[in-house]
Curated annotation (Swiss-Prot):
InterPro entries: 4Fe4S_Fe-S-bd, 4Fe4S_Fe_S_CS, NADH_quinone_OxRdtase_chainI, NDHI. The lineage of its organism: Bacteria, Bacillati, Cyanobacteriota, Cyanophyceae, Synechococcales. GO terms for molecular function: 4 iron, 4 sulfur cluster binding; iron ion binding; NADH dehydrogenase (ubiquinone) activity; quinone binding. Binds 2 [4Fe-4S] clusters per subunit. PANTHER family: NAD(P)H-QUINONE OXIDOREDUCTASE SUBUNIT I, CHLOROPLASTIC. This is NAD(P)H-quinone oxidoreductase subunit I. It comes from Prochlorococcus marinus (strain MIT 9215). [4Fe-4S] cluster 1 binds at residues 64, 67, 70, 114.
Amino acid sequence: MNNFLQQINSYIKEAFNAGKYLYNGLSVTFDHLRRRPVTVQYPYEKLIPSERYRGRIHYEFDKCIACEVCVRVCPINLPVVDWVMNKETKKKELRNYSIDFGVCIFCGNCVEYCPTNCLSMTEEYELATFDRHNLNFDNVALGRLPTNVTTDPSVKPLRELAYLPKGVMDPHEIPASDTRVGKLPEEVYDWMRPEPNENKDKVSNQIN
């Protein structure tokens, strides 16, 4: 009799624990169902990078003075600066400039320390290729203007992961029913800019 009662007691405990574990697992599942997904339908949808995004480096050949500061501050000595000394002017003449993005870590040191601002970080991140040698950009490829997601009519730009509402740190925290997930900087400026009538009222109040 005691063994039978012990078996029933253990069975009830196991059933209770199983129900508790099932409830914990389903609670996590239903919690994620109420959240907004963070996946995008690439390449038909693309994220808008943030303002300080470190993408492909843009290079302006005419501004470069071949000082090689970018080479010295680069952690891996990546930029290749090909120059010759002009004996008449006693100045450097730049022949070629190249960066291998297959090795670049996009730290931005070359952009930060460039004395002539001939280097800049762009928002371009689509550098995939079938041949790694195609990632070695010369001064012509580096001088190409970057592509902009917001001006491409073939894709739908998404701002969810770049510009979140105030106080939100994780895109998962945005409810699925919320259609306004964030604002671009120019939209924030337009929203904060007072109406013309408000300015007139303020001026009239100050005069009175």
